[in-house]
């Protein structure tokens, strides 16, 4: 809605002003932050600062545009509800965090979309778009001092406001499932709690890369290549300010679900016992190459710098991040798996979920006595 007009720009003018500079203007929302951004030529960076400041501070939320956007979001909510993997992730978040805000879908419940009015959006912006919550990041061929001065001019009058004070969620775990008509596969999300971004330790990212990054990883080499249980599978360490999740996702034929879960738990237990030196070297190099590659991409550099500022209050130098990767030992990676298994699994099943599948899954992911 912020792109639907400001006090000084109507909706078409926002698009025209950006496109006249050859720039992209957009936004995205994650569980713990919203980002408004522009991408274009470095010589126009100051223009981008002032345009984003206008959008963030002076959006008018026209009633007619709100009605149209509401219909778009309601349609999107239907599509999310009909998608088995999206459904599995929503169930997984609820299994992890219960009713905490961290467990809620970014799009929100349908009732909120139908209920929210212009006054609600105005109050939300006044509460959240304040100096204590905003970071401004620029990357690329720019003059940092000049951009810093422009940021002060454009955003300097923002009231400081109140910082966010959200209690971290308490991990629960357990099994959630939902049968979706018309699905031929079972979509699963299996995971465990890990530390959030404020714990500046890459051991959990290394653990995820050891377990499931690349075709030579245990997840893919064993479940896909050797046993043929899955076509698609992946593993990530998703870290937010307040919490984190070690996440394994896969799509499997319903009659292979039990075997898939059994083998997954065996692989996790094996990693908890020991991490092979070659697997650690592979994971370390994969993360280092990703870090170096992202450093050559201004958009990724901006996003990572903003997340660093929110979680740590500083931007981590590249050499420091590489040194931290090198400092994690094989025992340190195995310790991540040990802590996760001790916490207990959270599992979500969606799509083709047969009779008794959730009960069998609950027994299969239960830690061994």
What are these regions (language model features)?
Residues 10-169, 179-181, 194-195, 212-215, ...:
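Charge-rich, well-structured scaffold segments of protease-associated domains
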Residues 175:
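Active-site glycine/GP-rich loop and adjacent strand/helix microenvironment
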Residues 172:
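Catalytic and ligand-binding motifs that coordinate phosphates/metal ions
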Residues 1-18, 199-211, 219-225:
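Active/ligand-binding-proximal structured segments within catalytic/core domains
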Residues 190:
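A domain-level signal for the structural core that forms small-molecule/cofactor-binding pockets
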